[in-house]
Amino acid sequence: MPIITLPDGSQRQFDNPVSVLEVAQSIGAGLAKATIAGRVNGERRDACDMITEDSTLEIITAKDEDGLEIIRHSCAHLLGHAIKQLFPDVKMAIGPTIDNGFYYDVDLEHSLSQEDLDALEKRMLELAKTNYDVVKRRVSWQEARDTFEKRGEPYKMAILDENIAKDDHPALYHHEEYIDMCRGPHVPNMRFCHHFKLQKVAGAYWRGDSKNKMLQRIYGTAWADKKQLNEYLTRLEEAAKRDHRKIGKALDLYHMQEEAPGMVFWHNDGWTIFRELETFVRTKLKEYDYQEVKGPFMMDRVLWEKTGHWQNYGDLMFTTQSENREYAIKPMNCPGHVQIFNQGLKSYRDLPIRMAEFGSCHRNEPSGSLHGLMRVRGFTQDDAHIFCTEDQIESEVTSCIRMVYDIYSTFGFTNIAVKLSTRPENRIGDDAMWDRAEQGLANALAHNGLQYEIQEGEGAFYGPKIEFALRDCLDREWQCGTVQLDFALPGRLNASYVAEDNDRRTPVMIHRAILGSIERFIGIITEEYAGFFPSWLAPVQAVVMNITDSQAEYVQKVTKTLSDAGLRVKSDLRNEKVGFKVREHTLRRVPYMLVCGDKEISEGKVSVRTRRGADLGTYSVEEFVEILKNQVRSRELKLLGEE
């Protein structure tokens, strides 16, 4: 006679074991119709699963985050159902959910085209609209294996052989004639799976191992209703317009080529943005009392073995040999900073020491994961390491957090998700040390008035960390900033200071990054601004142009005045109509176009237009110079005349 406790604290008693759906039916027909699954004692369960003992129960509907994830997982099975009908020889591998959707890896000799995706999507919708029931059966390990052997599914058999114990009873989900295996839960009926779209096909190795066969990965998105789907597809269209690779080419910022995969060739305008970011961060380093250093980008294998990178990170490190010595190009800056700290005796009075570097790092990322500026092999980190005592952790982390928000707000990022990752199962140090470290981070977050999500067990083995993820104008999250405590590396590299009692102590090291990879951050802000960089970042801040040849000398004079004031300015004296010039520089996202005609010359002024099409009227040259200088100096996000 199970007693079911509902979220509002009310209870319902049943004479016999009862399913999740039956409990929903006892509450009301509307809830029963909306039921996708349930959370029994905190664990997600199928709507058909029986509850045999006293339990808590939350009904999961399409309005819940879990409900949407279940819809997406069931759409992966629906894709399996459809592809088996259109391509009977296909072998099914795995089909998990991902952010905003799902994918299925399939083994198929035929190379899938966009036309194939359209046909698959059409068949999926035809199947879903029959609103068939999804039937769940728990079977023995042997029955599951026999089922997939008969159906010619070697990947499902491999999953059973390698991942599921023989005394287990895996769940098989029946979509009419199609059968798939999954932990679940899944929707009880396909009426929940009407709003989806197949997006693309990519290659993927079985089990992610390049030694295995290359499969075809079909990506899709799925949502609870048509409105959500259309809104998401609209966001994707906007994201495509903002793609930093497309804008980077149009604005001549950088390029990449096959001979240097994952490495950036910065062109003049892109490098201008890069240097402006460095200059900005340098002003903040001075403000927050950091010293700037520069370490070598390549060091002997012996050092990397001491740090543990060689053993744990070796696959991602580029190596070379010289004079019978093996070297690795640094994937990160921290070991070099410890070497600098170790030069000379340090006292507790010297701490904290805040050491920053714009470090050129390289990581041998898989070629398939490379993506424009967002995922590269060669990058520059705005990295810093703070050497301090345990007593200084909280105040130093508090300062790091203030610096993070100070810098992000300059770019207009105010919606920031904060996550605190705590001790993993495998870790160094005792519980007391971890208690102090985690509490220090939590106190620093509280001191800054920040709400945060705790990620249990997600910290590094050497210390807990805080992550900062920017949410952009398309509601995407970009994890950029980190504040990481490290109780291991300083000791491994024999870092020490003389404490107040004259004993040698090992300092705590705080790893701190704000922009993260400067390359990636440029990609992020290129998409955030859609290439309309604020005037302080714009490679060219103003273009001065004439209407006829008679204004050429005045244009050159105005251009020199702006240039002498430290502004990035160009002149356009081409024999073209002024409307043509304005359109061209508007497409180049130049903030201001200064038009000089006979009237402007006679008054000593310029006619000012913006890249958004606003005609701001005339300004004296001196007045406009001061306006633009103030915008650049204060790093304003908006142009003159913009609200």
Curated annotation (Swiss-Prot):
Cofactor(s) listed: Zn(2+)
Keyword entries, A-Z: Aminoacyl-tRNA synthetase, ATP-binding, Cytoplasm, Ligase, Metal-binding, Nucleotide-binding, Protein biosynthesis, RNA-binding, tRNA-binding, Zinc
Superkingdom of this protein's organism: Bacteria
Broad EC category: ligase
Family: Belongs to the class-II aminoacyl-tRNA synthetase family.
Complex formation: Homodimer.
Name used for this protein in its record: Threonine--tRNA ligase
Organism encoding this protein: Mannheimia succiniciproducens (strain KCTC 0769BP / MBEL55E)
Gene name of the encoded protein: thrS
